[in-house]
Amino acid sequence: MTKTVKEIVSEIKAKMDQAGGLKHVYFVACGGSKAAIFPGLYLLQSEAKTFSATTYTSNEFVHATPKELDNRCVAVICSLKATPETVEAVKTANAAGAVTIAMTGSMETGMAKVGQYVVTYSNGDDQVYSDSNQANALRIGFELLKQFENYENYDKAMEAYAQIDKIVAEGKKKVLPIAQKWAETYKDEPVFYVLASGPN
């Protein structure tokens, strides 16, 4: 049986209390997964009072491993299908003594095999957004804040999760006709320029 984020963080809290307390949380991934874990990072950087948080790309984490990585750190490492360098990042964190939470698409991935704790998330065309990688990275952040610092906005945050799927469904319904009209209007254009930016 898989554990809930609340249960996972409860076990981590017991370990950290014995080790001297949580000092740092690393969010590690690459590509779209790195963008997806940004909400958890941003939450902790903004709200945590007694520990800090940073992000690394998977390969950077493996080849320029932070010196403070040890048994008082948590590494939240995300990859849908277990990108090789991200699996290596989990192994690197394990070897340093950190607690690893492998966020991945299923219990059969390489990530699930090497993570100390595993959080699977919804993905694909029928994705449940309240259980997506973004939502779970944020959920881990809220749970760390609650259990380590008794975060005052925790209950409001948990209530908000019940609204996410309805909001997304309504948004899709409103935007679909606009998107279809745009696609029909510009379908024969010879060139498209796509501009994008990362989360930070």
At which residue positions do the language-model features occur?
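Internal, active-site/partner-interface "lid" segment
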Residues: L144-E184
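Structured N-terminal alpha/beta-domain signature
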Residues: I140, L176, Y193-V194
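A short, well-structured juxtamembrane/interface segment
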Residues: K3-G21, E170-D188
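Glycine-rich phosphate-binding loops that contact phosphosugars or nucleotide phosphates
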Residues: G20-Y161, S197
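Generic low-polarity alpha-helical segments
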Residues: M1-T2, G31, A35, A169, ...
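Acidic catalytic cores of enzymes that act on phosphate-bearing nucleotides/polynucleotides
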Residues: W182, Y186-N200
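Short, flexible loop segments at the rims of nucleotide/cofactor-binding pockets, characterized by
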Residues: T2-E7, S52-T55, I77-L80, I167-K174
